[in-house]
């Protein structure tokens, strides 16, 4: 199981990469920003296996980005914390950069955040 161990690197990018550098972490946060809250929603949206999702959700809780509510329920919701919501501008910048540089000429990048999430 993945656990969160804060980086001791003096570089702020290295510290952020320690937490956010995992592909699943970014996609879980993306879907949480778009309204996913329950374990099954993340499984369905991401196609992630249950063990990987369980470990990433635990890691995001340890890091203070998600809160499980209620803590001991099998039907718990995973709620974004203020610390996680502070990442919205980072995701907006990442989406803008990707749209400008990773899509072929003439290829339309989806809007971020989607209009349905507004």
Region spans (language model):
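Amphipathic alpha-helical dimerization/coiled-coil segments
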Residues: 88-118
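Long, low-complexity, charged/polar intrinsically disordered regions in eukaryotic proteins
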Residues: 1-9
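Basic, amphipathic "hinge/linker" alpha-helix immediately C-terminal to the N-terminal HTH DNA-binding motif
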Residues: 21, 72-93
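Alpha-helical residues within the helix-turn-helix
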Residues: 44, 61-62
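N-terminal helix-turn-helix DNA-binding core of bacterial DNA-binding proteins
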Residues: 9-52, 74, 79
């Amino acid at each position: 199981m993945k656990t969160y161990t804060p980086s001791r690197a003096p570089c702020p990018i290295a510290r952020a990469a320690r937490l956010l550098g995992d592909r699943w972490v970014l996609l879980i946060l993306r879907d949480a920003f778009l309204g996913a809250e329950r374990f099954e929603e993340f499984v369905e949206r991401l196609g992630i296996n249950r063990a990987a999702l369980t470990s990433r959700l635990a890691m995001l809780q340890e890091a203070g980005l998600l809160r499980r509510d209620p803590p001991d329920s099998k039907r718990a919701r995973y709620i974004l914390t203020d610390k996680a919501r502070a990442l919205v501008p980072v995701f907006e910048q990442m989406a803008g950069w990707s749209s400008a540089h990773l899509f072929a000429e003439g290829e339309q990048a989806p809007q971020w955040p989607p209009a349905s999430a507004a």
